[in-house]
């Protein structure tokens, strides 16, 4: 769903395993925010839920982002880093979004 073939393949395999075990599937949209717009038919917007996170969880996300030094600096001089300011700000919001499919889907 996120547009990266390796990540989509891993997600598909994990989703199949969850469904085989009768578990609900939650998918976190990481890159969909970059290529989709509201109403984009490729995205199951009706399956999206928002879950609040605690201040402690936000702090842990901040610490985790800091560990990705290679993505916090420009790969090429003069270009923005992969994890630019907008991506970091979105990651530190006190809410996480997921697409939820029940076990029968």
Segments (PLM) and residue ranges:
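Metal-dependent de-N-acetylase/amidase catalytic core
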Residues: 1-105
């Amino acid at each position: 769903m996120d547009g990266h073939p390796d990540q989509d393949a891993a997600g598909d395999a994990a989703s199949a395993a969850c469904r085989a075990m009768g578990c609900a599937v939650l998918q976190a949209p990481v890159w969909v925010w970059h290529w989709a717009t509201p109403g984009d038919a490729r995205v199951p917007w009706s399956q999206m839920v928002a879950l609040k996170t605690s201040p402690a969880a936000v702090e842990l996300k901040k610490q985790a982002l800091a560990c990705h030094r290679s993505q916090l600096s420009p790969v090429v001089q003069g270009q923005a880093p992969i994890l630019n300011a907008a991506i970091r700000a979105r990651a530190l919001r006190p809410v996480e979004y997921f697409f939820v499919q029940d076990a029968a889907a």
